[in-house]
Each structure stands twice: as C-alpha cells, then as structure tokens.
Amino acid sequence: MSSKEKLPSSRIAAAGPSQQPKIMTTIVRRALITGSTSGIGRAIAEALAARGAHVLIAGRNTQRGEQVVAAIRSARGQAQFVSADLSSARSVAELATQSDKLLGGVDILVNNAGIFSFGPTAETNEDAFQSMYAVNVRAPYFLTAKLAPGMANRQWGRIVNITTMVAYLGMPGAALYGSSKAALQLLTQAWAAEFGPNGVTVNAVAPGPIRTPGTEGMGEALEQLGKTVPAGRVGTPAEVAAAVAFLVSEEAAYVNGATVSVDGGRAAV
C-alpha cells in the first residue's frame, strides 16, 4: 500500500458488556509491533487486530511473519508483514520509513522486540553487551524518535514498551538483561513527559515468567520461577497482550508514564 492510499474507515459501535473494548471509534488505528512473529509480540498483534487496528508485523522470520498475517486476515483483521533485524541501526531506520509508507502513518508503536541472556557479570563480554543494548535500547529509542513526532503532529498516539519484572527486581545473573530493560522503563517515563502534551501516551508493560517459544529453553526453571509469584504459575502471552490492548485504547487516554506489571503479583512481594 502506498503512502497516498487511505486505509478503510468503519464506524464501530460502542462496546457492550460482552464485547471487547475497541481501540478506535470511527477510524482505523495503525499499529507497528516489533518482534511480533511469535510469542508475546504475536499475541499483541492478534489482540490489536481483533479490536480493529491495522497491524504491521515486524520480525526477522518471514515465514512466521506471513503465518501471523494469514491468521489475522482469516479472522477478518488487517495485517501486513515487514522484515526487520533490529540489531542493525540501518534496519531500524528503514523499518520506521517502511512503516510510515505501508500504513500511511503509525498511531500505535509497541516496542516488543528484545533479546535476553543470563549469566555472571564477570563473564559478560563486550559483544554480548553491545548486542543486548542494540536491540533492547537503541532500537526502541530510534523507532520512537522517528515515529513519535508524527503522532504528536496528529495529536494522538500510543507507545507501549515491553520491559520485564527484572527491570525493577534484583536477580543474580540478570544484570545485563535487567539493566537494558530498566533503561527502557526510564525512557517510558521520559517520553511520557516529552510527548504527553501532544496527545501521545507512553507506557510500559512488565511481564513476569511467560511461556513463549523464546522461554522454552528454560525448561523446568521457568516452572520454578512461576511458583515464586503469588499467582503460583507461569503466565501466557495473551495475558500480556490484554494489558497492551487497554493501554492503546481510547479509554486509557489518561494513563501515561505508567508501568503495568503482568507478573502474577511478583512486583508486590
């Protein structure tokens, strides 16, 4: 779709008790979700599409990306896929440009893509440090830098950063990963102050232990981690997506600079 083509608009009735809350009322909101070919990102993309958004799936795996698009379209949603490797600064800039062209503007940005690894600080090498911060901090920083001004000009925008419970909880072996996400959490607050006066809200969602393809390698350790939270279990991507769906909705217009913990209560204890 070219930048000159207009996205279809449709009037959606106000949600009743049995209906899902809608992201928009009379126009289609356009959403970019990074790292959305699987796991939490895919669940977010599907949730926003189900609520009426036109979603742009971004990730490295084309096959998985097209599968997500097909699933959303089969449910009568609007979706497209764009290949992006957020470890590259050039690719980040290209993604911002492509998103604007494909969607005709981005109203909702979900900075979900991230990488993680755990280990002693003394065993962390510089390459691992640079890689972690490139994806977890640099990519969302410059995507926001490119896309938030357009939202501000239109006087409406939603940015949600996906962080983690270890961004605010000290955990052995999580210094590198936790610090990168803590940086994103601070950026959430700074951007809320910067862009809030122009109708753009910026919030974070901090998941706890969530079962995804990316955490499968943790094996029994994930289950044990789930038992440490008050809920006593591991969470699901859909539970994280539900929090994101609220934060990007019209109803959340007065929620800005907040971090919503989806961690089974771990932040409380």
Task: Write out the residue ranges for each language-model feature.
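Conserved glycine-rich cofactor-binding loop
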Residues: 37-38, 61
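C-terminal substrate-recognition "lid" of short-chain dehydrogenase/reductases
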Residues: 103, 141, 156, 233-262, ...
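Substrate-binding pocket helix/loop in short-chain dehydrogenase/reductase
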Residues: 120-121, 128-133, 159, 225
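Active-site helix of classical SDR
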Residues: 144, 180, 188
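Alpha-helical segment proximal to the catalytic Tyr-Lys
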Residues: 149, 192-194, 253
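Residue(s) in the substrate-gating loop at a strand-loop-helix junction
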Residues: 164
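Short, small/polar-rich loop/turn modules that mediate ligand/substrate recognition or access, typified
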Residues: 196, 201, 255-257
